[in-house]
Regions:
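Alpha-helical transmembrane bundle of multi-pass membrane proteins
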Residues: 1-25, 49-292
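Short intracellular "coupling" helices and adjacent cytoplasmic loop segments at the cytosolic face
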Residues: 27-38
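Short, conserved alpha-helical segments within structured domains
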Residues: 37-40, 112
Length: 292
């Protein structure tokens, strides 16, 4: 990060045009490219100007207006999905493994291995994102993760021993891998494409606030559910995210539109026309027709 260049867009927004030009010439362009760096810089300057024109005069309350409410719901809902899919289990993985019956050292080793698995799956998600549609990407992950959470909870209802503890822990690791492959990256794809340009920063910001609030709630209730001195539910705690996921699957199916391959102009027109969620993927229209 010490040697990383500042974004030319950020420099332009700060009025540091000469520094932005230098960054474009030295850091963002290959010596073999036959492109005029000044032309690239001019395009960036124009982009920043258009961005300012679009976002000027907007307020946070605008994201809840009739015009933007549907899009705001999708953004906030996807942030909530990302947070709530693994409630309880994901907040304290090592502690969960220990409560499932693993020795402390093994529980720590499992969490370290889980970190490596998550990194590999996150890298593979780049490839998967190109192959799958946005809705499919999220829904496939949701279905698999819901199933895994139910399996963890059901196994915990059986008489506990070390073997079942390892089974629950392995399932939790698989859940984490699936999460990094699907719901985690799909959330960022969807919120970036669904939010309106004029209020994008505000919409995503409010959604992230909701995500953080849900994370705080999870961190408060998890110790109570897992701790032997409190509820002592152990793996049965997975019933909570499993049930949440079950209902969230329906929300994703009926409310999250397919935006892959659409321009922002097309998406604005489709939301303005009230295109049903499941018709987004195949919807065809005259982009320049009047919009009510």
């Amino acid at each position: 990060m010490i040697w990383g260049p500042d974004s030319p867009y950020w420099l332009i927004r700060k009025g540091r045009i000469d520094e932005a030009r230098k960054t474009v010439r030295t850091r963002l362009m290959s010596p073999t490219e036959e492109v005029d760096p000044d032309a690239v810089l001019s395009m960036m300057v124009r982009t920043v100007e258009v961005e300012r024109e679009i976002t000027s005069g907007t307020r946070f309350v605008d994201i809840f207006s009739r015009k933007h409410l549907r899009r705001t719901e999708v953004v906030i809902g996807c942030w909530a999905v990302q947070s709530m899919t693994g409630w309880v289990v994901t907040s304290y993985f090592a502690y969960f493994y220990e409560q499932a019956g693993l020795p402390s050292v093994k529980a720590f080793d499992m969490e370290v291995g889980q970190g490596g698995l998550g990194f590999i799956c996150a890298c593979c998600a780049f490839w998967l994102s190109k192959k799958l549609a946005r809705r499919t990407h999220m829904m496939v992950g949701m279905v698999i993760m819901t199933t895994i959470m139910f399996l963890i909870a059901i196994l915990s209802c059986v008489r506990q021993d070390t073997g079942l503890g390892y089974a629950e822990s392995v399932l939790a690791m698989v859940w984490w891998g699936v999460f990094q492959l699907t719901v985690a990256p799909a959330t960022y794809e969807i919120i970036g494409e669904t939010s309106a340009l004029s209020v994008r920063q505000k919409t995503i910001g409010v959604g992230r606030i909701v995500y953080n609030i849900l994370g705080i709630v999870s961190s408060l209730i998890t110790p109570v559910m897992l701790n032997p001195g409190a509820r002592n539910w152990k793996g049965k705690s997975a019933f909570l995210p499993a049930l949440l996921n079950f209902f969230l699957n329906f929300w994703v199916f009926f409310r999250v539109p397919e935006c892959k391959g659409r321009t922002y102009e097309e998406l604005d027109a489709m939301f303005a026309r009230g295109v049903p969620t499941r018709e987004f993927k195949k919807y065809e229209f005259d982009l320049y027709a009047d919009v009510d």
